[in-house]
């Protein structure tokens, strides 16, 4: 999966001119995405990698892990109940992003719901969505 993700990150940099990537820090795909962007930065040092914060930084301090350059907290999440914070942070990112690289391995997951939301936005021309194929073990 990592080589495919690396290739897609590089394609977004070259073909779409993407210079800023925002990645969460809560799952295996997030870790792979951060690694793929960090590796792409070796060839494209101008790109940035931001950590998506689902909880307000004043409420929950987060030490910025390597390889992130900075963090991003979406506006308006202060009023979202904590149990919905991660899902809402992802939805808000779709609203302020031009591109999404997604991977869903379980059809009943929150990732699938977020992808469906992004695909509806893509039909309106608001975002370009790339879905990585499921890798069979």
Residue ranges and their predicted role:
Residues 1-137:
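Acidic/glycine-enriched connector segments
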């Amino acid at each position: 999966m990592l080589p495919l993700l690396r290739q897609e990150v590089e394609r977004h940099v070259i073909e779409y001119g993407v210079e800023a990537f925002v990645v969460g820090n809560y799952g295996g795909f997030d870790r792979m995405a951060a690694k793929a962007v960090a590796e792409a930065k070796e060839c494209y040092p101008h790109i940035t990698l931001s950590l998506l914060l689902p909880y307000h930084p004043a409420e929950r301090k987060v030490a910025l892990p390597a390889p992130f350059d900075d963090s991003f907290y979406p506006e308006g999440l202060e009023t979202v109940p904590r149990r919905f914070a991660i899902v809402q942070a992802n939805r808000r990112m779709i609203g302020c992003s031009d591109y999404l690289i997604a991977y869903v391995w379980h059809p009943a997951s929150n990732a699938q719901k977020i992808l469906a939301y992004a695909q509806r936005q893509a039909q309106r021309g608001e975002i370009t969505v790339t879905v990585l194929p499921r890798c069979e073990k």
